[in-house]
């Protein structure tokens, strides 16, 4: 398919700079696609450019689509293929989230606040607002339990032994909340910033609180928790949002 790049470029009235851009984009495209075009390979290419700037992505999509149409016109391709922005969405909906190795989350770090936030989500499946609402009085490290009081009700969650040292470190000098300044809880942005800084420091940039919570869900399911049990642990009104994780 690479052999058709130059004839394609020659068929268009392009400036020297545009020719270079087309050639560069199409060489990348052909390198990834190979000699046989199919939907799976096109989805792979689509995903490979997903994180580029909007202008760069549009340029590459346009160039690739023009080339695909040219290949169809000269009968190199029996079918007409076209890349669209929805292709990546279709693929991500089908992808099953995978469990990541979280050992690095427990290693020593200067970003101790962000670390504890991430561990509370990973270990207990808490939301950021639930983490922010943890009160010192409701943490019993001797019996390794957290009593979580929210608008949805009260949940008593077990604390793993590995989590205790991290909590002990942060409880020193706290008056009301686990995360506070002189008895006043930190803002939502504070939690976001500290979590973002920590996950970036360990090479997991882009790992959000939602994705960390998803890791808890996947591990609990793997451990044999039923959808109803997991729904209760998370304090959900209905297990409906968990159904996608339990589909065979």
UniProtKB/Swiss-Prot annotation:
It is found in: Cytoplasm. GO terms for molecular function: DNA binding; tyrosine-based site-specific recombinase activity. Coiled coil: none annotated. Gene3D superfamilies: 1.10.150.130, Intergrase catalytic core. Its main location: cytoplasm. It comes from the Bacteria. Residues 85-248 form the Tyr recombinase domain. Pfam families: Phage_integrase (PF00589). Belongs to the 'phage' integrase family. XerD-like subfamily. This is Tyrosine recombinase XerD-like.
């Amino acid at each position: 398919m690479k052999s058709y790049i130059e004839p394609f470029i020659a068929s268009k009235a392009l400036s020297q700079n545009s020719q270079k851009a087309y050639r560069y984009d199409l060489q990348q495209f052909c390198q990834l696609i190979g000699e046989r075009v199919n939907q799976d390979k096109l989805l792979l290419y689509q995903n490979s450019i997903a994180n580029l700037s909007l202008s760069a992505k549009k340029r590459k999509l346009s160039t690739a689509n023009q080339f695909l149409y040219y290949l169809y016109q000269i009968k190199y391709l029996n079918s007409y293929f076209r890349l669209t922005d929805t292709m990546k969405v279709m693929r991500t909906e089908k992808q099953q989230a995978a469990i990541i190795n979280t050992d690095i989350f427990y290693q020593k770090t200067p970003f101790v606040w962000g670390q504890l936030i991430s561990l509370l989500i990973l270990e207990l499946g808490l939301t950021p607002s639930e983490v922010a609402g943890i009160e010192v009085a409701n943490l019993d490290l001797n019996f390794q339990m957290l009593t979580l009081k929210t608008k949805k009700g009260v949940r008593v969650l077990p604390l793993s032994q590995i989590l205790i040292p991290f909590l002990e470190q942060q409880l020193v000098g706290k008056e009301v909340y686990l995360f506070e300044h002189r008895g006043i809880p930190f803002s939502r942005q504070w939690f976001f910033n500290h979590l973002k800084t920590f996950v970036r420091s360990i090479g997991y940039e882009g790992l959000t609180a939602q994705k960390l919570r998803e890791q808890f869900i996947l591990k609990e399911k793997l451990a044999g928790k039923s959808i109803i049990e997991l729904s209760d642990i998370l304090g959900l009104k209905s297990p409906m949002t968990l159904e996608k994780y339990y589909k065979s």
